[in-house]
A protein has these predicted regions:
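Short, surface-exposed loop/helix-turn segments at secondary-structure junctions
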Residues: 288-294
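Alpha-helical scaffold within the catalytic cores of cyclic-nucleotide enzymes
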Residues: 221-235, 247-284, 295, 299-304, ...
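Cytosolic regulatory/linker segments at or just downstream of nucleotide-handling modules
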Residues: 310-365
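Catalytic NTP-binding/metal-coordinating core of nucleotidyl cyclase/transferase enzymes
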Residues: 184-262
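Arg/Lys-rich, alpha-helical DNA-contact motif
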Residues: 1-43, 47-182
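Conserved, well-folded catalytic cores of nucleic-acid-processing
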Residues: 58, 62, 85, 164, ...
C-alpha cells in the first residue's frame, strides 16, 4: 500500500497542475523518471549511438539531442534486448528494425484508441448532446485528467492481456503461414471442401471518421450481429469477425450463395451500416483451432478486395458448381490478377429470376 499521505500531489491528478500531471503519469507508466541521454543509453546497451537513433526513430518518436535526458531504465533494457538478439545472430538489424516499426505503428494506434475510449466512457452522453459536441474532439480538462488517472491505474492489469492477445494472434498467423506454404495440404484429398466467404463493409475507414467511439462500437456490434444472424440462418458457420469484415464457411454452395446475397440485401436495408461486398471461393481448406486456412481462404479474401460495392463475386470453381444449382447464376465478368493467387476469372453471383436461396440447416458447415 502507498505510504504517502492520502491526497498528496502524486496520488491524485486533481492535486496537480496541468503541467505536473504529465510528469506524474510518465513516472507511473515508465517507472523511474527519465534521467539518461541517448549517448548514455547507447553505451549502456553496448551499441553505437547511430544504431540507438535508428531504433528510436523506428519506434516513431521525435528526434532528440544526445544529451537530452529523455530515457529511463526501461528504454535501456529494451535496447539491450534488441542488441542481444542481433548480437547472438537470432535476427538481423534490418529485421529487428522492421519488427520495431510494426510494434510501434500498432502500439501507437492502440494507445490512441484506448485513450479515446476511456475519455469517452467518462463523458456523459447527455452533456455531449447539450453541447452538440462529438466525443472524438478534445475532452475537457477534468475528463482528460480522470482518463489519464484511470489508464495509469489499470495499466499493470491490461499489459498481460495485451501480451496474451498478441501471442494468440501470432499463433494463428504462424498456423496460416505454415498451412499456406505446405504443398501437401493443397494436394491432400482428405482436406474438406468448403465454400469460403468474406463480407467486407465498403469505405469503412472514411465512414467511421465521422463517428464517435461509442457510435463506432454500436456500428461494429450491429454488423457482427446482423452478419451472424444471416449466416447461421442458412446453416453457415462464422469463423471470425474483425471490425469491418466477417469470415464464414459452408459445405453447400447454394446456401453459401444465399448467405452472400442476403448479406448484401441486409446491409443495404440497414440505415446504420454502409454497403457490403462479398467474395466467395470454393475449394479445400485446413481447419485448425476453429479457424480455416489455405489457398481457398486467401482467394476469397483477394476476391472480396476487388468486388464492387453491393455485389458478390465468386471464383471459377464456385461458378462451375453453381452451374448445376437452381436459383442462382454466375455471370462471367473479367479476369483479374490477384496478389499471391495469380490470374482468376471472376463471376458475379446473382439470383435467378424469381429465385431465392433456401435456408439449409444441416449443421455441417
Amino acid at each position: 500500500m502507498p505510504t504517502e499521505e492520502a491526497g498528496a500531489p502524486d496520488d491524485h491528478p486533481e492535486a496537480a497542475s496541468g503541467e505536473e500531471l504529465p510528469g506524474q503519469i510518465e513516472r507511473r507508466l515508465l517507472g523511474r523518471p527519465a534521467s539518461m541521454g541517448r549517448r548514455e543509453v547507447s553505451e549502456g546497451a553496448g551499441v553505437e549511438p547511430v544504431v540507438a537513433r535508428r531504433f528510436w526513430h523506428a519506434m516513431g518518436f521525435q528526434n532528440i539531442e544526445d544529451d537530452d535526458a529523455m530515457f529511463t531504465e526501461a528504454d535501456l533494457e529494451a535496447l539491450k534486448r534488441v542488441a542481444r538478439l542481433i548480437g547472438e545472430g537470432e535476427v538481423s538489424e534490418e529485421l529487428a528494425l522492421g519488427m520495431t516499426r510494426a510494434f510501434a505503428r500498432t502500439s501507437d494506434r492502440l494507445a490512441v484508441w484506448q485513450t479515446q475510449l476511456v475519455a469517452e466512457s467518462l463523458t456523459s452522453p447527455f452533456s455531449e448532446e447539450l453541447e452538440g459536441r462529438d466525443s472524438r474532439s478534445v475532452p475537457e480538462p477534468r475528463i482528460a485528467a480522470d482518463a489519464a488517472e484511470l489508464l495509469a491505474s489499470i495499466c499493470d492489469d491490461i499489459e498481460p492481456l495485451l501480451v496474451y492477445v498478441w501471442r494468440r494472434h501470432l499463433t494463428n498467423a504462424i498456423a496460416r503461414m505454415l498451412a499456406d506454404a505446405d504443398p501437401a495440404v493443397h494436394a491432400d484429398p482428405s482436406a474438406p471442401i468448403r465454400v469460403v466467404g468474406f463480407a467486407d463493409l465498403v469505405s469503412f475507414t472514411s465512414f467511421v471518421r465521422r463517428m464517435s467511439e461509442r457510435q463506432l462500437a454500436r456500428l461494429v456490434q450491429r454488423f457482427e450481429l446482423l452478419a451472424s444472424d444471416v449466416i447461421t440462418e442458412h446453416g453457415g458457420r462464422v469463423i471470425k469477425t474483425v471490425g469491418d469484415e466477417v469470415l464464414f464457411v459452408h459445405t453447400d454452395a447454394a446456401a453459401a450463395s444465399a448467405i452472400a446475397l442476403d448479406l448484401v440485401d441486409a446491409m443495404a436495408q440497414d440505415e446504420l451500416l454502409p454497403p457490403v461486398r462479398v467474395g466467395l471461393a470454393h475449394g479445400r481448406v485446413v481447419s485448425r483451432l476453429g479457424d480455416v486456412f489455405g489457398l481457398t481462404v486467401n482467394k476469397a479474401s483477394r476476391i472480396t478486395a476487388v468486388t464492387p460495392s453491393g455485389h458478390v463475386y465468386v471464383d471459377e470453381d464456385m461458378a462451375k458448381v453453381l452451374g448445376s444449382v437452381s436459383g442462382f447464376s454466375a455471370i462471367e465478368r473479367r479476369r483479374r490478377m490477384l496478389r499471391g493467387i495469380g490470374v482468376v476469372t471472376l463471376h458475379e453471383l446473382q439470383r435467378a429470376p424469381g429465385g431465392r436461396g433456401l435456408a439449409l440447416r444441416d449443421g455441417s458447415a
